[in-house]
């Protein structure tokens, strides 16, 4: 379990300790969240936060960088080993910054880019109209088919017709294996560069349970805090020396100034943890648990986008299955200490602020070695079935609500947060 802290600033101490309680006592099913180790927390909270050092190891614009050079070099070398790449940048503050730098590396303002649309499982930074990617680039989108699965032939036809400068593959809510080889063939067919955003599946790739884009993509981006189980931030990788030079310039001085060395240290620690043999077992458990969990809902007749999962997440169409919105589902589950996020489904008729679905991920609870997925599924199924009744007539169901909360509490107690990996 995470431990509470003591600070002179009692207001911030109170907020942090409340969050410690929340994380310890809640079932965490947000697919983009995980639990970092004590070592990662120590690195992120270290004196490295005091150091400024624009530039790269050995080529800084500030003095006194000998120790942070060691930290950043370790992060780079560990990352290169983890994914089998020749060049890596560990400085991006976030996935959005990494994607901005990667797109700028491969395309110019106004060029055409092609990514999966948001409702189908794409990300804001893959060309959504209110994102920089949709404002500074001419964005066109591909989508999944009626079954919620990528249709590679349809994507190829669109790419040949539109001739984008960059094709983006890798998603925030797609539950099936991404065929990077087919995307390479599509990119070659239309003369495009291929950008793989593996933010969600990076840890699965590192653990050997999802194919790698390294042999096929021109440039690869990822966050470090999802399945990689690291400090918050991002990375960019490539095997092309010229692309590496450009991406480094776009990170600094293009989009960022001084690196966050405390965060880079946290990334380095997480990369080291992911290089251990035990990490492969963790990645395998994440996928197994996601299938086990999704299969419970499928057996209850619940609508799952694409009909199941091959990775760490799946999306439930709660509008179709329970007659409620994703927002309603997120709120009612939250009252029972089960944390999810509302999410659009393919061809969603509800707005992104409301949605028809909820996205479920198993990365965080797998870090706790959680093993009672059917029991959790039954609790969630009952809550979602009774969402309106529990919300509007709570006083009539106090005993049952209390019992369900007690069951959730028992699960979090049985499977506490693990802080050493």
From Swiss-Prot:
GO terms for cellular component: cytosol. The keyword Transferase applies. The record marks 225 as: Plays an important role in substrate specificity. One of its GO terms (molecular function) is pyridoxal phosphate binding. Disulfide bonds: none annotated. Its main location: cytoplasm. Its EC number is 2.1.2.1. Pathway: One-carbon metabolism; tetrahydrofolate interconversion; Amino-acid biosynthesis; glycine biosynthesis; glycine from L-serine: step 1/1. The keyword Cytoplasm applies. (6S)-5,6,7,8-tetrahydrofolate binds at residues 118, 122-124. It comes from the Bacteria. Keywords: Amino-acid biosynthesis, Cytoplasm, One-carbon metabolism, Pyridoxal phosphate, Transferase. It is found in: Cytoplasm. Its cofactor is pyridoxal 5'-phosphate. Homodimer. HAMAP family: SHMT. Belongs to the SHMT family. This is Serine hydroxymethyltransferase. It comes from Mycoplasmopsis agalactiae (strain NCTC 10123 / CIP 59.7 / PG2). The lineage of its organism: Bacteria, Bacillati, Mycoplasmatota, Mycoplasmoidales, Metamycoplasmataceae.
């Amino acid at each position: 379990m995470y431990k509470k802290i003591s600070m002179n600033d009692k207001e911030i101490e109170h907020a942090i300790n409340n969050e410690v309680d929340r994380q310890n006592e809640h079932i965490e099913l947000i697919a983009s969240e995980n639990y970092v180790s004590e070592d990662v927390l120590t690195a992120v909270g270290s004196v490295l936060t005091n150091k400024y050092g624009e530039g790269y190891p050995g080529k800084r614009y500030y003095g006194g960088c000998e120790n942070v050079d060691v930290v950043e070099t370790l992060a780079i070398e560990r990352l290169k080993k983890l994914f089998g790449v020749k060049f890596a940048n560990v400085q991006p503050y976030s996935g959005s910054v990494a994607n901005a730098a990667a797109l700028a590396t491969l395309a110019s303002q106004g060029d055409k880019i092609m990514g999966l649309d948001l409702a189908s499982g794409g990300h804001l930074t893959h060309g959504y109209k209110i994102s920089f990617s949709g404002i500074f680039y001419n964005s066109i989108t591909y989508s999944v088919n009626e079954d919620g699965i990528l249709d590679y032939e349809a994507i190829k036809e669109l790419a040949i017709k539109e001739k984008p400068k960059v094709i983006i593959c890798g998603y925030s809510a797609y539950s099936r294996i991404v065929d990077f080889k087919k995307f390479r063939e599509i990119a070659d067919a239309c003369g495009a560069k291929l950008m793989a955003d593996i933010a969600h599946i990076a840890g699965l790739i590192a653990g050997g349970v999802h194919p790698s884009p390294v042999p096929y993509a021109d440039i690869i981006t990822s966050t470090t805090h999802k399945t990689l189980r690291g400090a918050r931030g991002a990375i960019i990788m490539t095997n092309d020396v010229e692309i590496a030079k450009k991406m480094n310039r776009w990170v600094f001085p293009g989009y960022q100034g001084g690196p966050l060395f405390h965060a880079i240290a946290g990334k380095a620690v997480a990369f080291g943890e992911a290089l251990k043999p035990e990490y492969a077992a963790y990645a395998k458990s994440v996928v197994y648990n996601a299938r086990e969990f999704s299969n419970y809902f499928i057996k209850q007749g619940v609508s799952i986008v694409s009909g199941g999962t091959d990775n760490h997440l799946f999306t439930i169409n709660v509008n179709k299955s329970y007659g409620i919105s994703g927002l309603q589902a997120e709120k009612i589950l939250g009252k029972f200490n089960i944390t999810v996020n509302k999410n659009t489904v393919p061809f969603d008729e509800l707005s992104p602020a409301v949605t028809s679905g909820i996205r479920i991920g198993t990365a965080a609870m797998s870090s706790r070695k959680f093993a009672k997925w059917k029991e959790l599924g039954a609790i969630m199924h009952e809550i979602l079935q009774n969402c309106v009744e529990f919300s509007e007539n709570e006083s009539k169901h106090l005993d049952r609500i209390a019992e369900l909360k007690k069951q959730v509490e028992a699960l979090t107690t049985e499977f506490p947060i693990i802080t050493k990996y």
